[in-house]
Amino acid sequence: MRKIMLFMVTLMLILMSSCGKSESQFDKELNKAYAVMEKTRFSSALMCDKISSTWNKAIFDNRTPSGKYCSDFNDALTELFDNFSESGITDSIKNWNNEMQKLTSQMNDAPHSRKDCYNDFVDIVSEVSSFSRMATSPSGNLRSYNEQTTSTFENISKKIDQFKIKYDTFIKK
């Protein structure tokens, strides 16, 4: 009877340890997703900044990104988005955002010791996804757009700083 009980406990331990990802596998996936997240965040920030400055210049100077006269800021933003499309930056941000979300969802079977890390990372990814949409589909007026992008960027930066402090050993430098 003891042998059967010992066998069952051993078998259960083996099965439990084989379920889910290993910590090293999770850390690899985290680092890959983290790198894509940073690319998405950085590119979105550059794009949001360019949108804001173009919008501002169109309203106050009546100029498009190429310096042409415009009486409507929508003309300037259309020209800017045409430039973004030609350069591929809009598609890149959308693709990185999709990749970031896909990689993050693949990490959902995190080891117990990494569950908090995963949950915190999901929170950051959600904010970065929202920020990337602000870059690819601006809305509102110039003031609200600037307030929203600035607030979101600062929020993301704060969360990333906290994430780096809490999970420094999981992220490769």
Task: List PLM regions with ranges.
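N-terminal hydrophobic targeting signals that begin at the initiator methionine
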Residues: 1-2, 20
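C-terminal amphipathic alpha-helix
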Residues: 26-77, 114-173
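Polyanion-binding interface signature
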Residues: 67-93
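C-terminal motif of bacterial Sec signal peptides marking the signal peptidase cleavage site
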Residues: 15-18
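Sec-dependent signal peptide recognition
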Residues: 2-10
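Mature extracytoplasmic domains of secretory-pathway proteins
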Residues: 86-121
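Acidic/polar low-complexity scaffolding segments in large eukaryotic proteins
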Residues: 20-25, 112
